[in-house]
């Protein structure tokens, strides 16, 4: 039976099936699955959901994507066998039922009182474009992580994605807040592993002036927020309103999604109206120093591997080795370019109101990571193949 519905004492319940198909000749772990609630045709406002893989309940989450307090998407991760299929059962409920799952991701944004040394949890902040709010947020922006990696997004015109590397898999940012103390470092905590400077860091979207990447300015307003906090995925957003760029006035949202078990970010960029001929760019940082090597397939995939100090304190902290990768689908790629800080592709999406690309990093300190640039660049190509051949999701009505 594809689906069934029931209504008991005012409570509505509906079960819907998904058919998942992996077309690759390899097992896949923690495959992200996201379905629109509207596409499930519940016939009522969904307040909770339960996802079953065979006879086992698996962690999932409902996310309110437009902040109207009504769930819009259901997300979970699932393992898939090579060349295999799975049938997933989803029970939708009109009542709010709290389900406890292991927290495999974490996100936070903290306003700080520098005089009192205190922090307050916040979900969203909007400031005029000419206001310097960078140091008013602990960590300079939203911070989020999976078991593998951590990230933060700078609350300024750079809007750079900055990485946090780990020795061991696990969640650390709730405790370390991106700045581990000496005791935490002695326990094996990770920390900031890259000095991003004026670069795009790990795949941040930038403007392009024909010669180099430029920051997102001037703008009328800038907003950063945490949209989803787990247990399966975290979503952070950066929104600018009134960006004066290449003769246009743009309202743009960059949405970063990180799933459990993943190091890669899904980067969705949205605009209020169709794009014209604006040219943007993204890619990977040309890591400072003389030890950086890069790789490109000249078809939207670019990576770098290098070693440099992550902070200005070169006495307390050692040089860090970092690998970065970004993949842009070919339909958006205009040209492969570079400047002194970055290896890049320019991007155009004429007539579109959104586009998607992907980015990730590794730190050499990872005990579960990559030995050298060759292994990293090899993994990049495997990653691209998986992205270009996603698991098929079919709703069975």
Predicted regions and their residues:
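Bacterial Sec-dependent N-terminal signal peptides
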Residues: 1-15
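Alpha-mannosidase-like glycoside hydrolase catalytic domains involved in N-glycan trimming
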Residues: 11-116, 127, 131-132, 139
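Short, well-ordered beta-strand segments enriched in hydrophobic/aromatic residues
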Residues: 16-22, 148, 254, 265-273
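Solvent-exposed beta-strand/loop surfaces of large extracellular or lumenal domains
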Residues: 47-73, 244, 288-305, 326-332
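Beta-strand-rich recognition/accessory modules
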Residues: 66-80, 324-397
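Solvent-exposed N-terminal domain segments of exported/luminal and surface proteins
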Residues: 94-217
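Extended, loop-rich substrate-binding clefts of extracytoplasmic carbohydrate-active enzymes
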Residues: 186-260
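Acidic (Asp/Glu-rich), glycine- and aromatic
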Residues: 252, 263-297
